[in-house]
Each structure stands twice: as C-alpha cells, then as structure tokens.
Amino acid sequence: MRYTVALTGGIGSGKSTVADAFADLGITVIDADIIARQMVEPGQPALNAIAEHFGSELIAADGTLRRRALRERIFSHPEEKAWLNALLHPLIQQETQRQFQQATSPYVLWVVPLLVENRLYQKANRVLVVDVTPETQLIRTMQRDDVTREHVEHILAAQATREARLAVADDVIDNNGAPDAIASDVARLHASYLKLASQFVSQEKP
C-alpha cells in the first residue's frame, strides 16, 4: 500500500484548491467526490438505476443527472439516502482501489469530504485538514453555489463539526486568508510527506 495522506475539510473550506497545489507538485490525487460524480455520468449503470428508482424527472434533457433535485430528494428521506449510498459506495470503493493501484507518486493525496463522518481516517497514514471558520464556509458556499444561507446551514449541520475534524488531524492548513498562502503551506507539507513516505517504504521492505 502506498503512503496515504487523507485530505478533508468542510464544505467551502478549499479542499480542491489545496488538492490542486499538491497535484502541481506531481502528487497523485484521488478525489472521492470526483469519483462519485463519474459513477453517475450518462451511460453509467448507476445513473440508469437512479432513474429507475427515483423517476426520469431526475434526468435532464441532455441525459445528465439533476444533482440538486437528487440532493433535495434524499435530504428529507433518510431511507432514500441509504438506498443511494448502498448503490454508489461499492462502485466508489472499487474505482478508488483501482486508482490507488495505478498511482506512481511517492505518496497519494486522498481527498475525502466525509472522512470523519465515515471514520475513513483509519485507512490513511496521515490526515490533513483544511480549516476555516463556519462563517467563511457559509459565505464561500453561498457565492460558489448560488444558494441561500439556510441551505448551507443545513449542509453544515449534517457534516462533522470543525472540532471533530481537527481532533483527527495530524496537519492543518488554515485557509481563512488569501488563497496565495496555500502554496507555501503545501510546499512545506510536501517536503515532510516525502520524508515520511520514504521512511514508510523502507519499513515495508522485508
């Protein structure tokens, strides 16, 4: 198994910006959200199953999934959310495993928004948390997704708390300031992770 750094953070924290900075340094990034989106692209069996289960009104005219409509449907129906998770989780795990096997960089950055909620931090060698204040999360998400404050507050209430994420963190990037500051933080952590990955490999050898 390749040395794995799990990256997490709440909605609007800037996980993608941080992940992109690691990718620019040549690190393989495996993003659970991107994989989940790929699983429901037109032509994928999962999208057909969703249309069959929830109805064709969740499929747009161009054949793509109406994500917001699906989110609204499962938000107020826990049993529907459970059905969707049972459909997608095995597919996501399978694709994640495939990408890990194909990774070539000294360590892998595994981006998992629900790392704490699903207790997946146990599968990583190290946990990196992108930390921002809840108010920053609200403002950024409202601007990015063009949604109401109330909508974002509902999402925040369903996610792990800031304290719960920080409790499992080995490293923290404070992303409350300007995005430019991220590059230096990532460069510093990258140097540290290269050393840790090298030690990990030497310990793994018989």
Swiss-Prot record:
Subcellular location: Cytoplasm
Domain of life: Bacteria
Any GO BP annotation: coenzyme A biosynthetic process
One Pfam family per UniProt: CoaE
Residues that hold ATP according to the record: 12-17
Domain DPCK: 4-200
Cellular component annotations (GO), alphabetically ordered: cytoplasm
Keywords noted in UniProt: ATP-binding, Coenzyme A biosynthesis, Cytoplasm, Kinase, Nucleotide-binding, Transferase
Cross-referenced PROSITE patterns: DPCK
EC number: 2.7.1.24
Job of this protein: Catalyzes the phosphorylation of the 3'-hydroxyl group of dephosphocoenzyme A to form coenzyme A.
Protein name: Dephospho-CoA kinase
Organism: Salmonella typhimurium (strain LT2 / SGSC1412 / ATCC 700720)
